[in-house]
Amino acid sequence: MSDNLVQTYSIYIKAPAQRVWEAITQSEHTSRWGYGGDVEFDPRPGGVFNNLSTPEMKQMGMGDVAIEGKVIEIDPPHRLVLSWKASWYPDSEPTRVTWELTEFPSGLTRVVLTHDVTAAPQLAAEIAGGGDPQQGGGGWSWSLSGLKTLLETGVSMEESAA
């Protein structure tokens, strides 16, 4: 999977689509799943969607913004398409991340995340995961697991492991 330039991940979360949307787009939630960090989000096409660096990321030499992005398409709480540029590859081109949320009458929401790294193929192995998640190697599988854990239990994976 590490050579796949268009990677798709699908999970089901026992939460309404609106709650999932808020967890993806609001700092009070984004700081508690994945690799943490607040977001700057201007919810309109062309608006910013930046994942800010945590203090730990800054200690490793990262600047204030870990992931720089722009909103390409937005249809709350169903679809969000973003440009996505990793700050640790300053010479790479932006990639594209698509979030698709489908709510079912049962109370489940299917989350489909597609990351097209064709413009920055060196990211393929990193976003596929397989490394130590505590060192940033868990990729989207780690991040989505954290999102699901937070929404279904109310605590982050780090909090529940403590």
Language-model features: where?
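Hydrophobic ligand-binding cavity/cleft-lining segments
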Residues: M1-E40, R44, A162
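Intrinsic-disorder/low-complexity, polar/charged segments enriched in Ser/Thr/Lys/Arg/Asp/Glu/Gln
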Residues: N4-S10, A17, V48, A66, ...
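Hydrophobic/aromatic beta-strand elements that line small-molecule binding cavities or substrate pockets
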Residues: I11, I67-I72, T95-E103
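A short, structured loop/turn motif at beta-sheet edges
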Residues: A17-Q18, D42-R44, I72-H78, E100-R110
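Hydrophobic pocket/interface hotspot
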Residues: V20-W21, T30, F49, V71, ...
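Glycine-rich portal/gate segments that line the openings of hydrophobic small-molecule binding cavities
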Residues: F41-K85
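Beta-strand/loop substructures that line and gate deep hydrophobic ligand-binding cavities in soluble
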Residues: S87-S141
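Short, highly charged C-terminal tails/helix-capping segments
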Residues: T149-A162
